[in-house]
């Protein structure tokens, strides 16, 4: 077999090693056993090869004639390669062995394999494209769809091809992987938005179409929830100097997202409908009725699928995608600014997920569960019946410990089912080693996943709540067993997901049962022999040099030699000269040799051949599975939802949360801040909240640091927790469903957009006023602090009156006590304040402020609490005294409505003139003539200001 293996790859005798080679096979006789096995007749193997090639080339790629594969066949008589010693090191190494050169145009580095591959590849594809993209690193390229677009020369895009990698670090479940196509109607249809999105980790397409206003708030919020990797728009919307307002707003709000423009003709609603009819699985075909007349989302779907097929270099198998329509009315809207203010996903200190609402609730065990939790937090439910069903599940999980721990045990063993499906339903346009390895790996993962269906069903058998019973019913689908049986006729029973790159490599090599392909069995025996030879060679080197050498393996280096010793006593210079690529880590040396590098090359060639033949068998198997694969979408949905509900129940066990009710009133008894509870050593102070339609605006006053902002965030977080189906931190809680949640809390300047604090306030308030309605929850913190007192009071007063008129539930914190008089004009206004206490500080002989963080009725009785806070700080006492005197004088002036005297105006005019002269003397870089003109204008301005200051008539120039 060894001779046949080398002959197929056109190896020459130059591959022979330094020791006397076998005259027949050209390899070193590392062991008499392996040497004897290489005497297999070339004639018989050659005949087998011709038969295999004829069989493969006569069958279409995805519709092969079925090969009878009876169950119960065992592995080939040749044992799997021994991995003892090679398992010691699974870490990746920075250095890598040179890969063998592949034949020109060959996908598998083998002319023979390439010929078989070309003969078998007959699946029609929709678009032509370049060679397959690498699955790990992004490439910059120009797409054919965007040809002719002058402002776009390329983009970078990341496309995952495998569900999991046992040889690399795990990718975050929330790494951007969504591509979105957006199109807007023209003419009278302007404002009608069509969207289509697909997650490259999940084979699901979401379609949306809705009417938006001129602020495009719904579009921006929807994109924020999707967190896209790339956005596709028509090139007519992005013309330089004449781009649409929608394109401008999207680019301003998503600066770090890649944009691709494609020709308008690809936004074709007829083609979009054809795509959906071709790709949508039967169980979700009702979407056709929903979108038949929604032309803009169909157009977006056409452009999206055409583009994804190109960048993925693959097409989706017919009837393999879950396609669904989601309207904008099915979930609550939380804009991106509010999500940031409330710290829903990332905190405002280090921008990580800890100390956020997501961090409080995230005890999920799967990537799908984590993604579902994230999307639910950003888009809470508005349907009370659905929320109540979730709450029933959480309640049963809390009451039944056996169910809780049983589900947790089973769910934690599931892999990322959505990403697994995404890879399985894609058909590569060009077969590569990566594509073959990915399909084999994910078929093993699919087997692992299906084997967990029965344990999950057993755990749910005795559940009583409707939702859990529904999930149990979905698991009784006979197709799970049917798919698993088909897989087991081809895949070994002991082929399973394992940690460690060498473990997983072995699983892939021996995934297919023996006797299904005789040529595959021969190739695997060859691989076994090569691995045994490597182990034997290293054992001989250890004996030859009397060193404690052992075989190790990493994904980057392949097999290499490792030695644990006292590196101080034995330097690298003292190692034998044939050891090369020496690296030292602590008390361990890692190195290889020229012979071992050649053996690794042969091992890789053997793997390529095994992967290719296994891939062809897997493709035949997948063609039989595709018609039943629809049930896996239900399984994916079941697992992710159960994982999220378990996470809610887990969070409840760590704190005294209560089940919320849903009425027309927002009533919270002794509620507290969930994030603050997690990061504080002590339990936060609890407060009551009561808002109804007859009292829908709360004006909240109190000193700085008394807890006003924290209280506002607490209310919003509790509202979101209730609407996603979680228990809430309170003794009792009743909520009115909020269709939108708006906040205006941040007061930082926006340097990037050159916005001051006040301008940012006005933009955020304008956004709220344009989009709020009677189903909104609005939280406004200290509006008007960015301008002078009079204007701040006026703006705050007007905003409050508008919010009073639309009946939105509003909490408004302020330092402007004048707003508290609104309750005299409007019966639906309530005044609240945070209490503080004054404690005598004996050491400094001053009063200290004690913050109670308790909310009480009425307006605050504290006066000049800013001065008291300054006095309690390290500010010098002389400055505090001056400030108090000045405050007293200013207050008196305001009360008496006094105007400044002419003498003060004269002094101010002189002061302004002197200041400008000093600035000109210090900093001016003007030319003499321009400086002379500037000083002349300054003199004229002073001459005009001074007479007005002293009450004299102005002089006019002749």
UniProtKB/Swiss-Prot annotation:
Any one Gene Ontology BP term: female gamete generation
One cellular component term from this protein's GO annotations in UniProt: recombination nodule
Extent of Low complexity compositional bias: 91-107
Disordered: region residues: 51-110, 124-161
PROSITE patterns, alphabetized: DNA_MISMATCH_REPAIR_2
Gene3D superfamilies named in the record: 1.10.1420.10, MutS, connector domain, P-loop containing nucleotide triphosphate hydrolases
Chain positions recorded as ATP binding sites: 702-709
Keyword presence, Endoplasmic reticulum: no
Location in or out of the cell: Chromosome
Function field: Involved in meiotic recombination. Required for reciprocal recombination and proper segregation of homologous chromosomes at meiosis.
Subunit organization: Heterooligomer of MSH4 and MSH5.
Family as reported in the entry's similarity comment: Belongs to the DNA mismatch repair MutS family.
Protein name stated in the entry: MutS protein homolog 4
Lineage: Eukaryota, Metazoa, Chordata, Craniata, Vertebrata
């Amino acid at each position: 077999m060894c001779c046949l293996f080398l002959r197929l790859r056109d190896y020459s005798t130059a591959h022979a090693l330094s020791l006397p080679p076998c005259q027949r096979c050209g390899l070193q006789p590392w062991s008499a056993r392996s040497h004897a096995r290489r005497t297999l007749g070339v004639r018989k193997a050659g005949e087998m090869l011709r038969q295999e090639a004829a069989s493969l080339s006569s069958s279409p790629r995805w519709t092969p004639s079925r090969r009878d594969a009876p169950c119960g066949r065992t592995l080939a008589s040749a044992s799997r390669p021994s991995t003892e010693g090679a398992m010691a090191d699974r870490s990746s190494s920075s250095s890598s062995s040179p890969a063998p050169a592949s034949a020109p145009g060959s996908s598998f580095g083998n002319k023979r394999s390439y010929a078989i591959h070309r003969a078998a590849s007959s699946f029609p594809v929709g678009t032509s494209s370049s060679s397959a993209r690498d699955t790990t690193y992004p490439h910059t390229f120009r797409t054919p769809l965007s040809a002719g677009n002058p402002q776009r020369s390329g983009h970078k895009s990341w496309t995952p091809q495998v569900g999991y990698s046992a040889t690399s670090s795990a990718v975050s479940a929330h790494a951007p992987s969504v591509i979105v196509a957006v199109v807007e109607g023209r003419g009278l249809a302007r404002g009608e938005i069509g969207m289509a999105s697909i997650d490259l980790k999940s084979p699901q397409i979401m379609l949306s179409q809705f009417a938006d206003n001129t602020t495009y708030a719904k579009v921006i919020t929807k994109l924020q929830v999707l967190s896209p990797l790339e956005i596709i728009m028509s090139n007519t919307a992005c013309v330089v100097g004449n781009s649409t307002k929608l394109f401008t707003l999207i680019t301003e709000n998503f600066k770090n997202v890649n944009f691709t423009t494609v020709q308008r003709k690809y936004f074709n609603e007829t083609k979009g409908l054809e795509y959906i009819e071709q790709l949508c699985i039967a169980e979700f075909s009702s979407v056709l009725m929903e979108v038949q007349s929604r032309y803009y989302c169909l157009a977006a779907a056409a452009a999206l699928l055409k583009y994804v097929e190109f960048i993925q270099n693959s097409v989706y198998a017919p009837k393999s995608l879950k396609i669904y329509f989601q309207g904008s009315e099915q979930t609550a809207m939380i804009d991106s600014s509010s999500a940031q203010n409330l710290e829903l996903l990332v905190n405002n200190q280090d921008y990580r997920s800890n100390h956020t609402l997501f961090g409080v609730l995230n005890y999920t065990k799967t990537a799908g569960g984590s993604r579902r939790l994230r999307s639910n937090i950003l888009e809470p439910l508005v349907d009370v019946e659905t929320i109540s069903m979730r709450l029933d599940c959480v309640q049963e999980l809390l009451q039944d410990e056996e169910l809780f721990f049983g589900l947790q045990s089973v769910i934690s063993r599931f892999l990322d089912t959505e990403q697994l499906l995404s890879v399985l339903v894609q058909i590569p346009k060009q077969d590569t080693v990566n594509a073959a390895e990915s399909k084999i790996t994910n078929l093993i993962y699919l087997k692992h996943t299906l084997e967990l269906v029965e344990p999950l069903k057993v755990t749910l058998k005795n559940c009583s709540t409707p939702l859990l019973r529904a999930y149990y019913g979905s698991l009784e689908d006979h197709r799970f067993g049917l798919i698993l049986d088909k897989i087991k006729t081809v895949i070994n029973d002991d082929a399973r997901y394992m940690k460690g790159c060498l473990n997983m490599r072995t699983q892939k090599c021996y995934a297919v049962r023996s006797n299904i392909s005789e040529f595959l069995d021969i190739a695997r025996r060859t691989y076994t022999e090569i691995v045994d030879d490597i182990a034997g060679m290293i054992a001989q080197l250890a004996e030859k040099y009397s060193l404690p050498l052992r075989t190790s393996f990493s994904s980057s280096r392949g097999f290499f030699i490792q030695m644990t010793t006292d590196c101080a006593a034995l330097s690298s210079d003292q190692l034998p000269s044939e050891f090369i690529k020496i690296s030292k880590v602590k008390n361990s040396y890692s190195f290889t040799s020229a012979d071992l590098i050649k053996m690794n090359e042969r091992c890789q060639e053997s793997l390529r051949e095994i992967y290719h033949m296994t891939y062809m068998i897997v493709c035949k198997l997948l063609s039989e599975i595709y018609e039943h694969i629809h049930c896996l979408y239900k399984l994916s949905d079941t697992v992710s939802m159960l994982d999220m509900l378990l996470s809610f129940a887990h969070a409840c066990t760590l704190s005294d949360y209560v089940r919320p009710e849903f009425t027309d009133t927002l009533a919270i008894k002794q509620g507290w801040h969930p994030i603050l509870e997690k990061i504080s050593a002590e339990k936060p102070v609890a407060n009551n909240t009561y808002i109804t339609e007859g009292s829908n605006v709360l004006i909240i006053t109190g000193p700085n640091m008394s807890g006003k902002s924290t209280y506002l965030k607490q209310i919003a977080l509790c509202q979101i927790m209730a609407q996603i189906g979680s228990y809430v931190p309170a003794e009792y809680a009743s909520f009115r469903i909020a269709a939108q949640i708006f906040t205006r809390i941040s007061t930082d300047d926006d340097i990037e957009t050159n916005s001051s604090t006040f301008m940012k306030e006005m933009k955020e308030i304008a956004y709220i006023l344009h989009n709020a309605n009677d189903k909104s929850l609005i939280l406004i913190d200290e509006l008007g602090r960015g301008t002078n007192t009079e204007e701040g009071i006026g703006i705050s007063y007007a905003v409050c009156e508008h919010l009073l008129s639309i009946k939105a539930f509003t909490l408004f914190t302020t330092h402007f006590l004048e707003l508290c008089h609104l309750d005299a004009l409007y019966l639906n206004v309530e005044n609240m304040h945070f209490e503080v206490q004054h404690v005598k500080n004996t050491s400094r002989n001053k009063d200290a402020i004690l913050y109670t963080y308790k909310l009480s009725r009425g307006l605050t009785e504290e006066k000049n609490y800013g001065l008291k806070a300054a006095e309690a700080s390290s500010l010098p006492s002389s400055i505090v005294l001056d400030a108090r005197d000045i405050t007293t004088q200013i207050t008196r002036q305001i009360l008496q409505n006094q105007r400044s005297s002419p003498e003060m105006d004269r002094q101010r005019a002189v002061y302004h003139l002197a200041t400008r002269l000093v600035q000109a003397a210090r900093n001016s870089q003007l030319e003499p003539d321009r400086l002379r003109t500037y000083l002349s204008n300054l003199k004229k301005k002073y001459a005009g200001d001074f007479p007005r200051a002293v009450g004299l008539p102005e002089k006019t120039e002749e």
